[in-house]
Amino acid sequence: MQPNEITFYQRFEADILAGRKTITIRDKSESHFKAGDILRVGRFEDNQYFCTIEVLSVSPITLDELTEQHAKQENMGLDKLKEVIKTIYPNEHESWIINFKLIG
């Protein structure tokens, strides 16, 4: 069995599978992905594989630079998006947006 290369909280699984969530915002430790990378995706809670994505782009961003468009790509409101990022990465000032598409 192949290992998963990126994980998402289980609460995001349905949105990813439905194509409603098309970006993820990560810290520097996950900024190494490149456009064209094909990634096996697992749930954070149990590492269970649930899909495969293709990375379309990776770019740095600060919390203040986030827009309603980013929030829409995350399938949530902008205030909620900023709150989630602050909760997951409380000490980070710069994050990376990984834009992806579901391929399987």
Swiss-Prot record:
One MF term in the entry's GO annotations: hydrolase activity, acting on carbon-nitrogen (but not peptide) bonds, in linear amidines
EC number in record: 3.5.1.135
InterPro entries xrefs: AC4CH, ASCH_domain, PUA-like_sf
CDD domains per the UniProt record, alphabetical: ASCH_yqfb_like
Keywords assigned: Hydrolase
Domain of life: Bacteria
Recorded catalytic activity of this chain's protein: N(4)-acetylcytidine + H2O = cytidine + acetate + H(+); N(4)-acetyl-2'-deoxycytidine + H2O = 2'-deoxycytidine + acetate + H(+); N(4)-acetylcytosine + H2O = cytosine + acetate + H(+)
SUPFAM superfamilies, sorted: PUA domain-like (SSF88697)
Family: Belongs to the N(4)-acetylcytidine amidohydrolase family.
Entry-linked NCBIfam families: PRK04980.1
HAMAP family to which the protein is assigned, alphabetical: ac4C_amidohydr
Role of this protein: Catalyzes the hydrolysis of N(4)-acetylcytidine (ac4C).
Protein name per Swiss-Prot or TrEMBL: N(4)-acetylcytidine amidohydrolase
